[in-house]
């Protein structure tokens, strides 16, 4: 597997970072969640993701919103979804970054998400046998998530 670099250079003294690789989640859900979480405080982001998993707060879909139903509540836009699987995976990556910050001696109460992004991973290629000796591709896309947490003052 190729070495994957972080998109943003950060000062290692007051930042902690983590990466989730080869996650089997939707690329579109990951893009919308990363856009929504960017710049949030870590505690607020974890609470937000837990509310999304519990189907209480929808994630506004601003780019990939074709044929999406409207959701009640103030979410910024009218259309949104509850990407539970992607929220759980991103929550695991954020927890890993928080533990890395604890290991470095940073104050976990004063952490905010400086950078979060989703990148396309490799495609797991499979084939489904069909009638009359044919086969159809059944591919699974994977996603890489990068998180950099910064201690603010």
UniProtKB/Swiss-Prot annotation:
Keywords: Ribonucleoprotein, Ribosomal protein, RNA-binding, rRNA-binding. SUPFAM superfamilies: Ribosomal protein L22. It holds the Pfam family Ribosomal_L22. One of its GO terms (cellular component) is cytosolic large ribosomal subunit. GO terms for molecular function: rRNA binding; structural constituent of ribosome. One of its GO terms (biological process) is cytoplasmic translation. This protein binds specifically to 23S rRNA. It makes multiple contacts with different domains of the 23S rRNA in the assembled 50S subunit and ribosome. Part of the 50S ribosomal subunit. This is Large ribosomal subunit protein uL22. The gene is rpl22.
């Amino acid at each position: 597997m190729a070495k994957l670099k972080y998109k943003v250079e950060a000062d290692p003294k007051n930042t902690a970072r983590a990466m989730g690789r080869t996650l089997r989640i939707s690329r579109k859900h990951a893009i919308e969640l990363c856009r929504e979480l960017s710049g949030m405080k870590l505690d607020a982001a974890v609470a937000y993701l837990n509310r999304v998993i519990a189907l209480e707060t929808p994630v506004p879909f601003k780019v990939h919103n074709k044929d999406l139903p409207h959701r009640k509540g103030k979410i910024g836009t009218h259309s949104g979804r509850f990407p539970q699987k992607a929220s759980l995976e991103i929550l695991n990556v954020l927890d890993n970054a928080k533990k890395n910050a604890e290991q470095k001696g940073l104050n976990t109460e004063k952490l905010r998400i400086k950078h979060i992004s989703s990148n396309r991973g490799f495609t797991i290629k499979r084939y489904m046998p069909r009638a009359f000796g044919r086969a159809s591709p059944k591919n699974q896309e994977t996603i890489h998530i990068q998180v950099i947490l910064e201690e603010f003052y």
